[in-house]
């Protein structure tokens, strides 16, 4: 992508489309580097991408697609140093961000963009889901993406995750049952990882509805699939599935089996508080709390 854009820019340095896509490609590379914990490379990518996005904006003020790049920069340049203070020295020499402005820009790109509307909607959904913890807004965007691309497994799974976050367990069951069925049918994109996630959340739906015995087979299946899929150590799904299995055993009065499960969890990487919960339930058995929905 960058090479293609460079070739176009050699012919016309003011090619707005080439500038936009080059800046976007570098920006996406920076985001990938950040998620791989290569913070220096991520900061450097942001430093290189911003002038390109600003240049495209100055050449075409009406182009809402450009707001994808400026919006992402403004949001993450403001939020990341606060979430990860050790990154601050790496970004001393790049412009400060503005979280609220970033959200506003991404919203405009999502609603008015010609080429970048889907990407802007996706990143805005992730921002609301992971950083802002505004699950209702994330759910609305996930539903929008799934409605437009009903066979896209990523958007389908995010819809389910957002429903989990707003405690709509009836809808959670419906969404993840559909995902599991598509995975069983071998539908394109619905790989084993989709089936694993579906099993976990179907188990959670049973747990939340006070049906631990029905939940157990789902957690067993999730754990079994993790043993096939987790080539580089236990995943979050493995840790949480084993924790839930222990909790079900406690409900069933099988304390020795429950203790064995919690000890397994403590041997795995902590995920979403799994270690703290396992430690707590080793000291005192888990007791079922049924919440009305």
Where are these regions (language model features)?
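Residue at a conserved register position within TPR or TPR-like alpha-solenoid repeats
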Residues: 26, 33, 74, 127-129, ...
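Short coil/linker segments at helix-helix boundaries
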Residues: 1-16, 21-64, 69-111, 115, ...
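Amphipathic alpha-helical segments of tetratricopeptide repeats
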Residues: 3-6, 50-54, 104, 110-111, ...
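TPR alpha-solenoid repeat register
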Residues: 18, 66, 119-120, 155, ...
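Structural signature of alpha-solenoid helical repeat scaffolds
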Residues: 10, 58, 94, 112, ...
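Primarily a tetratricopeptide repeat
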Residues: 3, 44, 51, 97, ...
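"A position-specific structural signal for the A-helix of alpha-solenoid helical repeats
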Residues: 21, 28, 69, 123, ...
